[in-house]
A protein has these predicted regions:
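Early exported N-terminus immediately downstream of N-terminal targeting peptides
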Residues: 21-83
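Bacterial Sec-dependent N-terminal signal peptides
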Residues: 1-25
Length: 161
């Protein structure tokens, strides 16, 4: 019995460490498709997010946005300017990856050229992925953190997708 308890404790104690090393959607997408397409990936790290939050509030809109930004740990933006056909292909590859990814992304919203996926852990959204394509441009925005559903609602109120 003692070895089982020890094994259980070892597994439970290492789970947070494994969760910290999960690869986010954008990094996984670039790893799979970066050699085929000229993908440009920009990352806003947790440290940079902290610095952004230290900036003074100078607009009333920041009163609404600041609590949402506090929930975001990092941001990755993947861009590719290419032919319209290649942009559609990248969009379709991102859709397939999200639908069949083992971490379990759920589609939140979708239209012809834009889809939003979320990944939850408990009551929090730990990852929000926006996939878009327009004539010759593919864009993927990946937010990670411990976000509430308010981050999705604010986009709807502001008239965004």
């Amino acid at each position: 019995m003692k070895p089982l308890v020890t094994l259980f404790l070892a597994v439970v104690l290492t789970m947070p460490l494994m969760a910290q090393h999960e690869e986010d959607f954008a990094a996984h997408f670039v790893e799979l498709n970066g050699s085929e397409a000229d993908l440009e990936c920009t990352t806003v790290s947790p440290r940079m997010m902290e610095r952004i939050l230290m900036l003074p509030n100078d607009t009333t809109e920041s009163d609404t946005l600041r609590p949402l930004l506090e929930q975001v740990k990092s941001v990755r933006i993947v861009n590719c300017t290419t032919t319209p056909e290649a942009a559609v292909l990248l969009y379709e590859k991102a859709e397939v990856l999200a639908q069949y990814h083992p971490l379990g992304y759920q589609r939140y919203a979708h239209d012809a050229d834009c889809t939003i996926y979320t990944r939850r852990r408990g009551e929090f959204i730990v990852e929000l992925v926006l996939i878009m394509q327009t004539e010759g441009t593919f864009c993927l925005v990946d937010l990670t953190g411990n976000m509430t559903g308010e981050i999705l609602r604010i986009g709807v109120v502001k008239g965004e997708r």
